[in-house]
Amino acid sequence: MIVYHGSTEIIKKPDVIHSKKYLDFGKGFYITTFEDQAKRWAVRKGMRQEKAAIVNVYELSEKWDGFRVLSFEKENDKWLDFVCACRKGQSLNKEYDIIIGNVADDDVFKTVDMYFRGLWDKEKVLGELRYYKMNNQICIANQETLDRLVVFKESYEVVNSDK
């Protein structure tokens, strides 16, 4: 399957070591099946770092037998607790090779943050989340899995039309 990663660099040899720790699914290499989402990620990173926005395109093998996969089909209490724990820095992803689920992007995380800070309960947050258009993310949580399943295809620069 073709997947995408938004960046400010051409990443022919992706790695986990450069990942930030406090992400939705913890430390890992994040990809998506939505090209437009990767473009938005790239543009956002490019604007913050004052660099070119680059989308890297990869082939992700779908031969996942033998890998430890955690898949969140939708936002539910397990997804919410997992994302909040990882965003606090807990290393829950070490139990898995691949984690799949929806993105707690800026808009979604504003809602999740209400739960994170104890202002809303789970039911309120999950009820609000159904109004958001969600995108997916795939976190490859360790280097061995990344090396075995992900192959670089190409990269291209995204022109930010907001400039």
Predicted regions and their residues:
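Conserved NAD+-utilizing ADP-ribose enzyme module
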Residues: 23-24, 44-163
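Extended catalytic/binding region for NAD+/ADP-ribose chemistry, centered on the ART fold
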Residues: 20-45
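Pocket-edge structural micro-motifs
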Residues: 5-8, 33, 142
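Short, charged/polar surface micro-motifs in flexible loops or helix N-caps
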Residues: 10, 35-38, 62-66
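ADP-ribose/NAD+-binding catalytic cleft of ART/PARP-like enzymes
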Residues: 1-24, 56, 60-62
